[in-house]
Structure formats: structure tokens, C-alpha cells
């Protein structure tokens, strides 16, 4: 949600109550401000240091080291019960010219832990990230708590205006509370409270409801008509989970029916024979239209995207069906091999079965491809009478094709020999196992 634009959407005011501004302080259920480290540094912190506005003002400014961590929630611009907050804070140097910062509060202090981590975009260094843990009391006898802060700062960056170094002017702090000491495995998201949203008030949600405007187009009769279908919110969209149905007269709007009828309505003429010819032409055209399949676009004028999704779904189903059909070519042979190797219980038998199936599929796919090519060649329309040069070229192509087929047959023969050798080895192994079982049975009966 870090890259999404956000807009304030409020419920329409009542007729009696005056219109009031909606406070953009709460996110709608399911939406959370959760930017990445790169977005926090390269967008929010950088624009704050340069004094540039941001599209979504979600981070408040507070002197974070003058307040206890459990008191910081009231300074957050996003009113949420989630145990995670974001703030801008100015650094307070412990000494005027030194590099050490004063991170002590009235009841404790923030202590850095581990090394600062680099935030990069590919090879470009954007900023640094410091992890701090709040300790209650005074150093070095402070007690570690479950309050953690990630402090983001920019690397040395010269502003575009005066060239002064302002990388230490502000830092961005992400404060959160863990359930226990250790990695943040606990759930920092607060449970949903239905009563908080019972009034249906304004909420901050991502995205803007953009409506497409359709310009008026000149019609054939010279009148400019605006298509009101794009602005109507009461019409039903197509359900992509249902198959398309045939168009009915109710699906065609009255203006379309009138236009359709006027397009085929014969003009009045004093000549009775001309009128009869026009009427016969009209009947033929209507008969041709009855034979045509019904148009599906009439049902989907307001839903081009679901129609595309439906087409994609049908295409995926056709691809799956074609893959199933390809696998069915060798189903009988694979079943025979599986029945032959039913008695094999070792891992070597499974590997051999896989190899046999692969060889069978390879050979049968090649044979099916050649059959399809032959069928296409047989069904191709006869070519016109060719010149002697073209006949010679055709003969050369046939000779080349025959040589290619001969090489293909050689490969198929080699694969068949390999399969025969594999099957023979398995037969020998089964015979040996059978003899061993017979010996064991004979020794068991003798004893």
C-alpha cells in the first residue's frame, strides 16, 4: 500500500445536517499504511527534508525523545489501534559539535542494538536504518522492554536549492510494540471492532473512483446522442463465472431497436414493383440475420474487463483441454506398462517406469505430429500446373524430406531398441526374484 494513492471518501451528508469536513485520520477496515524501507527513505523522508509536499500526509512530526513510547499514539496522524506508528523527528545532539544523539526520555532511554543496516536501490545507497530498544530507568541499569524503534536517516545529500547538507535535519521513526522479547512474530494488527464503523462515517481508503467520460459522437442522422450506459450504476454486469447466454429482445435497448428497424425500413415509393423488390431484399436480410449467431457484446457493454477475463478463462480451459488430449494419446501404453510393473516394489522399478513412460511419450508424440502433418498435406488444395523448374524443386524437397524421415525412423528404432533392452532387463530381474521366492518357499516347506 506504500505506492498507492489515497483519497478521502465520505458518506453523503443528510438533508438536515450541515455539510462538515471529514477528518482524514482513519483508514478503512483492511487498509494499512505499511511502506517498505526504500519507500520510507526515498519518498517520505527525502521529501520532508527537502520541504516538498507528499501526496498522502500520513506521518506526523513529534520530538520522539521527549515522550514515552506508550504516549506516542496520540501524535499519529492515522488513528488506529494497531501497535505500529510512524513519525518524523528532529535529532537532539548530546553535544553541540558531536555526533552522539540524546535519546533519553523522562522515564527511560532508547538504546541502539546491532549495526546500522544500509538501504539500497540496486547499488545506490539511499539511507541507513538503526534499530533501537526502549529501556526503562537509567543506564546502565535500565530494564529492557518490548518497545522497538526503527530510525531511518538519509545519507549525505545536497539539496537542490542552497546545497547545504540536511541529512540530519529529520529522521523517520517507525515505533512498534512486540508481544514478547525476540523477533516480531506476534500480530501487531489490532482486532476489528464492528461498532467503530457502525455509523458509516467518512474513511480514508486507497484509490479514486474514476469514471470514464464518453464524448458525444455524431450519428448518421445528424443528431448528437450521448450514450448513457457508461454513467448508469443500476445495470448488472456480466458474471464471469457464468456462461454467456443468448441475446434476448429485452437486452436490446429501445433506441437500438428503433435504429435497427429504421436502417432496414424500405422507403416509400410510388412504384409498386420497386416496393416489392425492397420488401424481398428486407426479408432476405432478416433471414441472414436469423442464421447468424447472437452477439454477446450487447450484454457486456458496461463490462469490458470481465469479458476479457471470461475470454482468458476460456482460453486457459482450452489450453488445459489440449494438454489433456495430448496426454491421452499415450494413456493406453502407459497403462500397459503400469500393469506390467505392478509387482515391482523397489525404487529402481519406479525409476525404470518413469524412463519407459518418457520414451513412449517421446516416440508417440513424434508419430502423432507426423500424422497430423500428413493429414494437413492431404487436405491442402491442389496447386495449379507448375513449370518444370518448380517440379524439379518439388522433387528435391521430397528427397530431402524422405532423408529427414529416414533419420527420424532411425531415432525411433534406437528408442525402441532402448525400450526393449530396458524391458528385457526388468524381465530378467523379475525372473530372478521369482526364482528366489520359489527357493524360499521350498526351503520353508521343507523345514
Curated annotation (Swiss-Prot):
InterPro entries to which the protein is assigned, alphabetical: NAC-dom, NAC_dom_sf
SUBUNIT field: Interacts with JMJ14 and NAC052.
Keywords: Coiled coil, DNA-binding, Flowering, Nucleus, Repressor, Transcription, Transcription regulation
Signal peptide region: none
GO terms under biological process: flower development; negative regulation of DNA-templated transcription; negative regulation of gene expression, epigenetic; negative regulation of transcription by RNA polymerase II; photoperiodism, flowering; regulation of gene silencing by regulatory ncRNA
Chief place of localization: nucleus
Location relative to the cell: Nucleus
Coiled-coil intervals, chain numbering: 392-447
Gene that this polypeptide is encoded by: NAC050
Gene Ontology, cellular component aspect: nucleus
Annotated spans, Disordered: 1-21, 246-303, 371-392
Native species: Arabidopsis thaliana (Mouse-ear cress)
Functional note: Transcriptional repressor that binds to the motif 5'-(C/T)A(C/A)G-3' in the promoter of target genes. Also binds to the 5'-CTTGNNNNNCAAG-3' consensus sequence in chromatin. Can bind to the mitochondrial dysfunction motif (MDM) present in the upstream regions of mitochondrial dysfunction stimulon (MDS) genes involved in mitochondrial retrograde regulation (MRR). Together with NAC051/NAC052 and JMJ14, regulates gene expression and flowering time by associating with the histone demethylase JMJ14, probably by the promotion of RNA-mediated gene silencing.
Presence of the UniProt keyword Coiled coil in the record: yes
NAC domain boundaries: 27-178
PROSITE patterns (alphabetical): NAC (PS51005)
MF term (GO), any: transcription cis-regulatory region binding
Protein name: NAC domain containing protein 50
Amino acid at each position: 500500500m506504500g505506492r498507492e494513492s489515497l483519497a478521502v471518501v465520505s458518506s453523503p451528508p443528510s438533508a438536515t445536517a450541515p455539510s462538515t469536513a471529514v477528518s482524514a485520520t482513519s483508514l478503512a477496515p483492511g487498509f494499512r499504511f505499511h511502506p517498505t524501507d526504500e519507500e520510507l527513505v526515498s519518498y517520505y523522508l527525502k521529501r520532508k527534508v527537502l520541504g516538498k509536499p507528499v501526496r498522502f500526509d500520513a506521518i506526523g512530526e513529534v520530538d520522539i525523545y521527549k515522550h514515552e513510547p506508550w504516549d506516542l499514539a496520540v501524535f499519529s496522524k492515522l488513528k488506529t489501534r494497531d501497535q505500529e506508528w510512524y513519525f518524523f523527528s528532529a535529532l537532539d545532539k548530546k553535544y553541540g559539535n558531536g555526533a552522539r544523539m540524546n535519546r533519553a526520555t523522562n522515564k527511560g532511554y532508547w538504546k541502539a542494538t546491532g549495526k546500522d543496516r544500509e538501504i539500497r536501490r540496486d547499488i545506490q545507497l539511499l539511507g541507513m536504518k538503526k534499530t533501537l530498544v526502549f529501556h526503562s530507568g537509567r543506564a546502565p541499569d535500565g530494564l529492557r522492554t518490548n518497545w522497538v524503534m526503527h530510525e531511518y536517516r538519509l545519507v549525505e545529500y545536497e539539496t537542490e536549492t542552497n546545497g547545504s547538507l540536511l541529512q540530519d535535519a529529520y529522521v523517520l521513526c517507525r515505533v512498534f510494540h512486540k508481544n514478547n522479547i525476540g523477533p516480531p512474530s506476534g500480530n501487531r494488527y489490532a482486532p476489528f471492532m464492528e461498532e467503530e464503523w457502525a455509523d458509516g462515517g467518512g474513511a480514508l481508503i486507497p484509490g479514486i473512483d474514476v469514471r470514464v467520460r464518453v464524448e458525444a459522437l455524431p450519428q448518421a442522422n445528424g443528431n448528437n446522442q450521448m450514450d448513457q450506459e457508461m454513467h448508469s450504476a443500476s445495470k448488472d454486469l456480466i458474471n464471469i463465472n457464468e456462461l454467456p447466454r443468448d441475446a434476448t429482445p429485452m437486452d436490446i435497448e429501445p433506441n437500438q431497436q428503433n435504429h435497427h428497424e429504421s436502417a432496414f425500413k424500405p422507403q416509400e415509393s410510388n412504384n409498386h414493383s420497386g416496393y416489392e423488390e425492397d420488401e424481398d431484399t428486407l426479408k432476405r436480410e432478416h433471414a441472414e440475420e436469423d442464421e447468424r449467431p447472437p452477439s454477446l457484446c450487447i450484454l457486456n457493454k458496461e463490462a469490458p474487463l470481465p469479458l476479457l477475463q471470461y475470454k482468458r478463462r476460456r482460453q486457459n480451459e482450452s489450453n488445459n483441454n489440449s494438454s489433456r488430449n495430448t496426454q491421452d494419446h499415450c494413456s493406453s501404453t502407459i497403462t500397459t506398462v503400469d500393469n506390467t510393473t505392478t509387482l515391482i516394489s523397489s525404487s529402481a522399478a519406479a525409476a525404470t517406469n518413469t524412463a519407459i513412460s518418457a520414451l513412449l511419450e517421446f516416440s508417440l508424440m513424434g508419430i502423432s505430429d507426423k500424422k497430423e502433418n500428413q493429414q494437413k498435406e492431404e487436405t491442402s488444395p491442389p496447386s495449379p500446373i507448375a513449370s518444370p523448374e518448380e517440379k524439379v524443386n518439388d522433387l528435391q524437397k521430397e528427397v530431402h524430406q524422405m532423408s529427414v524421415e529416414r533419420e527420424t525412423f532411425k531415432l525411433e528404432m534406437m528408442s525402441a531398441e532402448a525400450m526393449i533392452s530396458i524391458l528385457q532387463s526388468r524381465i530378467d530381474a523379475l525372473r530372478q526374484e521369482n526364482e528366489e521366492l520359489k527357493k524360499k518357499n521350498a526351503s520353508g516347506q521343507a523345514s
